[in-house]
C-alpha cells in the first residue's frame, strides 16, 4: 500500500534492563537521515550509545514516507525486533530494513532503543 503525505518524526528511547536510561531523541523525516553512533557528529546525531557501538553505527532515514534503519558496517552488528510479530532480524548486512513505532533496535550487545511515534 502506498503511503501519502509526509512521514511523522520518530523518537528513540534508550532502554537498559527494561528501564528508560536516555532520550527521547527526535528523528526528523529526511532522506539523508540521522546517524546513531559513538562518534557521530552530523546534525541530529544520537551519541547516547554503549561501549561496543561503532563510531557511525546506524542510519535512520525516510524514503517515500517510509522509515528505514541501515547498519553502516558496524563492528558488532545491529538487530531489529519487529513489534508486529516479535521477529528478530539481523540487519548488519547494510540492507535497509523498514522501521515502525513499537520496534526495538539493538546496536551491539549494550545499546537498545525503543522506536516511538512522536
Predicted regions and their residues:
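Intrinsically disordered, low-complexity acidic Ser/Thr-rich regulatory segments
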Residues: 1-51, 98-104, 109-118
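Intrinsically disordered, low-complexity regions enriched in Ser/Pro/Gly/Gln/His and often acidic
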Residues: 18, 60-61
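Residue-level recognition of conserved beta-strand positions in structured domain cores
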Residues: 38, 62, 71-72, 82, ...
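Short histidine-centered beta-strand/loop micro-motifs
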Residues: 45-51, 61, 69-71
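Forkhead-associated
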Residues: 57-59, 65-104
